[in-house]
Amino acid sequence: ILLSSLATGSIGDAFAELNQFEDAYDYYVKASKSDNNYTTPLFLYKAGTVAMRLSKFKKAEEYFTSIKLDYPKSPEAKNIDAFISKAIASNQ
């Protein structure tokens, strides 16, 4: 499952490099569904940042909040409050 989510997330990375953000978003969301402490917060973070770029601010807030609540010890949680605040502010 770990390798599968990494492969799926890597496809998302490739789409992001090509500025195909809708496709990247879809792959990051798929990759984030793998329930493990390593890849899930990473791909929730990537899904959130791409969601912000696509003006999906409520979804971004959900992804960032999930990192805060479910993966508080992950590297992605370190400054997540700033991302949550930015998503909330952008949605208003």
Regions found by a protein language model. Name each.
Residues I1-S4, A31-T40, K68-I80:
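Short solvent-exposed coil/turn linkers within tandem alpha-helical repeat scaffolds
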